[in-house]
């Protein structure tokens, strides 16, 4: 198991926790002095009250919580939000309200998930052409939306 250093910047901060035994993401809670109202089609920056020190070669991703998205149309506009290994500031979550009603965030509300993952650094080798493939430049829905297409692999 990977050990990650964490500092509680606010004594009221709730540290990230896995809600279930096999959860991939840890729930991240809002650390607020007063409620925050996210109006329809607006954003709010929500503090977590903690900072982390990731080992080199890792990142943390902040992702939306499915229940907030399903029931309230609350998401993260920059999902997944990346926390780099050299960032030492407070973890903050940008929430966006895609719904038609104001959404109130209270202290302790679980507003995002955080997944820690290994990151591979790459070196780009500039060439004049790329190898051909059966897909070529097909993208943006080129396989359609109906049914479950049979794999051609």
UniProtKB/Swiss-Prot annotation:
The keyword Glycoprotein does not apply. It comes from the Bacteria. It is an enzyme of class 3 (hydrolase). Gene3D superfamilies: 2.70.40.10. This enzyme is involved in nucleotide metabolism: it produces dUMP, the immediate precursor of thymidine nucleotides and it decreases the intracellular concentration of dUTP so that uracil cannot be incorporated into DNA. Its EC number is 3.6.1.23. GO terms for molecular function: dUTP diphosphatase activity; magnesium ion binding. It catalyses: dUTP + H2O = dUMP + diphosphate + H(+). Keywords: Hydrolase, Magnesium, Metal-binding, Nucleotide metabolism. InterPro entries: dUTPase, dUTPase-like, dUTPase-like_sf, dUTPase_trimeric. GO terms for biological process: dUMP biosynthetic process; dUTP catabolic process. It comes from Chlorobium phaeobacteroides (strain DSM 266 / SMG 266 / 2430). Belongs to the dUTPase family. This is Deoxyuridine 5'-triphosphate nucleotidohydrolase. Substrate binds at residues 65-67, 78, 82-84, 92. Pathway: Pyrimidine metabolism; dUMP biosynthesis; dUMP from dCTP (dUTP route): step 2/2. Its cofactor is Mg(2+). Signal peptide: none annotated.
